[in-house]
């Protein structure tokens, strides 16, 4: 019987406060997250941003216990998925590849080679595909695989996105239903989907399918929820976690919360639709920041649906996903990592420079100006930032 390796790809997160700076550096070193006009500037810019953001981010992690639980939860998901697959007769072993913190993709590849895996199934723990999440992880895996003659020979099948998978939808409905049942008037409870945002240019200029998949997913969940409950609840979709000067997908979560408060919504069921495990965006951003905004807006009952974590229906769904990937049409790593044909952002292989209206280009220009100003002041020891007391 073939030895199957199931590779679960995720973001990763700092486990201790001292990890926050290096984690942010890794994050912003990824050109799929922030893009500069010349690759030589990528790492200096990542250092600048991670240095400026480190203190604020450390405070956020301190508010949830001093570190991210994402590795612990992902390891629990991997163990339970492995057990479920073996119960179904597969000789499967699960591995974890984090994009920006330990255990990195290189570590997972080394473990699979050492274990003599015969074929690999790759599952990104992002239900919805985006250039900056699954896309970045697939491209990193492809780069490492292409450079490894031994690992390159191992057959590999990939799942690009899985937001419409029945087990995922069913588990979301079960968790949402639990919170709705706590409301005095369940049919009046407002379901508030909040998804991690991406820059608007990723969708409009680069053809990222993320926004469409999020919208389709929220409607699928609402339809399944109606079948389960026998009524349709009012619902809204918004996007959170935006950073930087460029425009991100709208509507923004904090603005919608204020609008719902003005509309006299009393029972709010907050659904973190793009997160399969608890981490900083659920535990701090939603549970602390957005809850405070909602309460100030007059929303009386703020109920947040738990992330999927190791919910039994979700783990069952993941096992079905692995089996269907093995039995269905093959999607190889080349296809999974391929960006949409429409791409206008600068691909990693073709760094260009030009005067056009791309917000990503302007983001790069502004970032370069900030970096040069900071660099000059650090060298000279004087300038406007020193006068303002920033340096």
Swiss-Prot record:
Gene3D superfamilies per record: 3.40.50.1400
Alphabetical GO biological process terms: heme biosynthetic process
Catalysis: reaction(s): heme b + 2 H(+) = protoporphyrin IX + Fe(2+)
Keywords for the protein's UniProt record, in alphabetical order: Cytoplasm, Heme biosynthesis, Iron, Lyase, Metal-binding, Porphyrin biosynthesis
Subcellular location: Cytoplasm
EC number of this enzyme: 4.98.1.1
A GO CC annotation given for this chain: cytoplasm
InterPro entries: Ferrochelatase (IPR001015), Ferrochelatase_AS (IPR019772), Ferrochelatase_C (IPR033644), Ferrochelatase_N (IPR033659)
CDD domains given in the database record: Ferrochelatase_C (cd00419), Ferrochelatase_N (cd03411)
Annotated residues for binding of Fe cation: 196, 281
Residue pairs linked by disulfide bridges in the UniProt entry: none
Main function: Catalyzes the ferrous insertion into protoporphyrin IX.
HAMAP family membership: Ferrochelatase
Family that this chain belongs to: Belongs to the ferrochelatase family.
Stored NCBIfam families: hemH
The protein, known as: Ferrochelatase
Taxonomic source organism: Prochlorococcus marinus (strain AS9601)
Record lineage: Bacteria, Bacillati, Cyanobacteriota, Cyanophyceae, Synechococcales
């Amino acid at each position: 019987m073939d030895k199957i390796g199931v590779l679960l790809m995720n973001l990763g997160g700092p486990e201790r406060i001292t990890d926050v700076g290096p984690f942010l550096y890794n994050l912003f070193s990824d050109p799929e997250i922030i893009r500069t006009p010349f690759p030589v500037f990528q790492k200096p810019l990542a250092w600048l941003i991670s240095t400026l953001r480190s203190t604020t981010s450390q405070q956020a992690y301190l508010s949830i216990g001093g570190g991210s639980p994402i590795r612990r939860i992902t390891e629990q998901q991997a163990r339970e998925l492995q057990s479920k697959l073996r119960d179904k007769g597969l000789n499967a072993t699960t591995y974890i590849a984090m994009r920006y913190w330990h255990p990195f993709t290189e570590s997972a590849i080394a473990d699979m080679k050492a274990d003599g895996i015969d074929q690999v199934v790759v599952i990104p723990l992002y239900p919805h595909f985006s250039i900056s999440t699954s896309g970045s992880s697939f491209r990193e895996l492809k780069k490492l695989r292409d450079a490894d003659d031994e690992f390159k020979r191992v057959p590999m099948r990939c799942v690009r996105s899985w937001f419409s998978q029945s087990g995922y939808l069913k588990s979301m409905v079960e968790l949402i239903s639990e919170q709705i049942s706590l409301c005095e008037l369940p049919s009046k409870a407002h379901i508030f989907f909040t998804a991690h945002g991406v820059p608007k240019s990723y969708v409009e200029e680069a053809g990222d399918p993320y926004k469409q998949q999020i919208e389709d997913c929220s409607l699928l969940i609402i339809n399944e929820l109606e079948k389960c409950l026998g009524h349709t609840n009012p619902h809204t979709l918004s996007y959170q976690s935006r950073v930087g000067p460029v425009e991100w997908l709208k509507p923004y979560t904090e603005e919608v919360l204020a609008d719902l408060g003005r509309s006299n919504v009393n029972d709010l069921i907050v659904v973190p639709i793009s997160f399969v495990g608890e981490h900083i965006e659920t535990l701090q951003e939603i549970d602390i920041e957005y809850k405070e905004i909602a309460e100030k807006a007059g929303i009386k009952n703020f109920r947040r649906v738990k992330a999927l974590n190791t919910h039994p229906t979700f783990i069952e769904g993941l096992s079905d996903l692995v089996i269907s990937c093995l039995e269905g049409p093959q999607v190889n790593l080349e296809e999974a990592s391929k960006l949409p044909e429409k791409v206008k952002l600068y691909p990693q292989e073709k760094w260009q420079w030009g005067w056009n209206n791309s917000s990503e280009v302007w983001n790069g220009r502004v970032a370069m100006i900030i970096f040069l100003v900071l660099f000059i002041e650090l060298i000279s020891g004087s300038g406007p930032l020193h006068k303002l007391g920033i340096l």
